[in-house]
Amino acid sequence: MKGKMLLGLTAILMLTGAAVPVKADDVWKFDAQRFVLKEYTGTETDVVVPDTMDEGVPVKRLGTQLLAGSETLTSVVVPDSVTILDVGALSYDNNLSEITLSSNLINIGWNAISSNDALTELTIPASVCIIDSYAVSGCYALKKIVFEGACPLIGSEAFVMLSDDVVIYVPDDQIEEYKKVFEENNKNLNIQPSGKPAVLYSAEDYLDTENLTFDAETGSITGYNGMNTRLTIPESIDGVPVKAIGKRALWEDPLLGYVTLPEGLEYVGEDAFSITDTLKYVEFPSTLKTIDKKGFSSYRGFRLDLPDSLEYIGEEAFSYFSVETDLIIPEGVKELGPGAFSAASRLQRVFLPSSLEKIGDNCFSRSPITYVYMEGLELPEISDTAFDKCEYLRDIDLNEKCTKQQMLDVQALVDTMGLECRVWRNQNTEVEHAYFSVEELPDDPSKLYLTGYEEEAAKVRR
């Protein structure tokens, strides 16, 4: 009977021309398990994104291309419940002129606010920690960008294809930090003081101890039931030091974007953070020694800053990871386990320390590496499959003081893998200028050797 009454009321409203109210659930597709809005089917020009769905479940993410490609959308208000803008969430909207972002936003994803032709101003809330590559790009009408907090991590191409007239206003007490970051990214942008101090957040603001499960006997975090996107793990719980992140403690978390691990932590366990596809940055402590099997598998990080205390990177610890910067393994690491950096989709340059003793089976296999540098005079034990299917690998440079025999041994190894790669002795830091030339080998005139020059760091290959 109730259903018939509703149908009758709807018919009357349609006949009289009265508007039929539309519930949020009717125009938004929501994944309650991952707290993400995935689709919008409404026709409003001014959209206020709901902060809850499905009878009270908080909206934490705007999904991939959620409000992209609209010709009619003119304004969007993102509620304070939202902490993540996924890829292209607010992009390619030709008439979108006003965006109000969440005051709790942590991560502005790749291409998230791009190619919006009518957008003239944008305010980045103080809570934002990460702005990924191309996040605010191709908005040629944009004249004013205001940052309210400390300088976040900013992708190298985060602010590109903007008007020459755009001015970036930053807190007065943070201007040098912002200038440094933009200069490091080779962006010559007009940065001016905003006239206000920064609204600052500390790591302690993101503690969520009550939602962590903890094994006091082993000092291990064993699980997390909270909804933080930025999360700080405490140094101790109820007086017991946190020494480890246990097996699958935070794996497949749908919201984690920025994690601070505590001083005193020594071990990250198997699958601890694996398949956490929103994770963009980890602050590692100076005490960490081991990252075990698949500890950060599928890490799609903004960058990877491993600590000098690290000694062992386990089997597939960073397999399937995607990081757009160079991979620098810190001095102190002794072993890279099997498949440790396999199938790393954006990995191109790798720098290995003199402390390294072993590179395991398939360590870098199926990764698009083009260049490897080995610092040590004593070369590590290298598996004959370490660089298997690295079809783009062209150069491996050894320390300048390595012997010719070491160079030939590594060359023989890559030859057995069928790679079109040359091994060189390199990195002569005492040479100020070296120019390209080709000369014959004295013992075999049919073969040539090359001396090379790189503007940023002079090198001689021999």
Sequence positions of predicted segments:
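Sec/Tat signal peptide C-region and signal peptidase I cleavage site
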Residues: 20-24
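Helix-loop-beta element that forms the nucleotide-linked donor phosphate-binding surface
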Residues: 181-189
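A structural signal for leucine-rich repeat
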Residues: 137, 157-161, 181-182, 385-389, ...
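Bacterial N-terminal signal peptides
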Residues: 8-17
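Consensus positions within tandem repeat domains that build extended binding/scaffold surfaces
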Residues: 64-66, 86-89, 109-112, 132-135, ...
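Short N-terminal segments immediately surrounding and downstream of signal-peptide cleavage
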Residues: 26-35
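Positively charged n-region of N-terminal signal peptides that target proteins for export
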Residues: 1-8
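Structural signature of tandem-repeat unit edges
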Residues: 26-27, 42-60, 71-84, 93-107, ...
